[in-house]
UniProtKB/Swiss-Prot annotation:
Disulfide bonds: none annotated. This is Galactokinase. The lineage of its organism: Bacteria, Pseudomonadati, Pseudomonadota, Gammaproteobacteria, Enterobacterales. Keywords: ATP-binding, Carbohydrate metabolism, Cytoplasm, Galactose metabolism, Kinase, Magnesium, Metal-binding, Nucleotide-binding, Transferase. It comes from Enterobacter sp. (strain 638). Substrate binds at residues 34-37, 223. Mg(2+) binds at residues 130, 162. NCBIfam families: gal_kin, PRK05101.1. Pfam families: GalKase_gal_bdg (PF10509), GHMP_kinases_C (PF08544), GHMP_kinases_N (PF00288). It is an enzyme of class 2 (transferase). The gene is galK.
Amino acid sequence: MSLKDKTQSLFAETFGYPATHAIQAPGRVNLIGEHTDYNDGFVLPCAIDYQTVISCAKRDDRIVRVIAADYDNQTDEFSLDEPIVAHDTQQWSNYVRGVVKHLQMRNKGFGGADLVIAGNVPQGAGLSSSASLEVAVGTVFQQLYHLPLDGAQIALNGQEAENQFVGCNCGIMDQLISALGKKEHALLIDCRSLGTKAVPLPKGAAVVIINSNFKRTLVGSEYNTRREQCETGARFFQQPALRDVSLNEFNKVAHELDPVVTKRVRHVLTENARTVEAASALAQGDLKRMGELMAESHASMRDDFEITVPQIDTLVEIVKATIGDKGGVRMTGGGFGGCVVALIPEEWVPAVQDAVSQQYEAKTGIKETFYVCKPSQGAGQC
């Protein structure tokens, strides 16, 4: 049963009338450009065919009722006329409440709604299930009430909700690609201007995501440390962000910086350059060059930004040894576990899957999860 069918039937069964709209917003994978977003840099993600789907309808009062199909049909209900506060026990509710609260600050022109939510974006894998939910909820109210908000505004609204209401410090990439993704394309995003450029993926290329299933523990504290180190670097150069520092400037004075900060800054500067070049390589159908850039990106995350773990490095080595120069593979996401992404010719998928299933668990004691994804359209009706 599709997510749409599942949410529509649960909607009718629970609320006693049919939903008028079904909205989807996808998860994402970042092909290259890691830890560049909060440095005002460039990222190159694509939306994937795993998504959050919400069946919904307007109400004629100011109440919002929500059912989470993936959490044993837990429910939430709140009024638009009362201050919206965090839910004591249901974390998923806070994503919905946060988005609605921040939407009210942007535009008061909407009333209540009934929502049933389901999704298949793997949680905790770094594929942005939370951003997908935030963008889906924002799109629900935008569509039901014809709010004059574009995809970028819905994305910013989701980011604000996550930063200020849920309390998780994230950049803008995840929400923006969920809102604006384009089928069969990646999106080069300038995280300062929020400008986007659609980049076609080479014909016959598959996006493969492999979850290491290594439980991420350090991700929150270490993420914040990396941000602070980058901010220290930007202050040293008296610039608002590392985006504004050139590699030449950096190389001249790198020896004056704290050695750890030097490594962090070098990663961000070189990763920005790689990301812009990767967009050109993809547009020219040059998977070989894309593969080289992904390999450089992974080495930089491992050695300079120090956010990989042995299990992730093992996965990358297995895939790289299998595909050679036929494509690329690197860690993707915040780090300390999570997933690797590979961009490879479709005909190489079985060989990669075989190699990983034969070697990864034997070397690490953990069984991976393998996803083959299609670059998909951003949020909208489904």
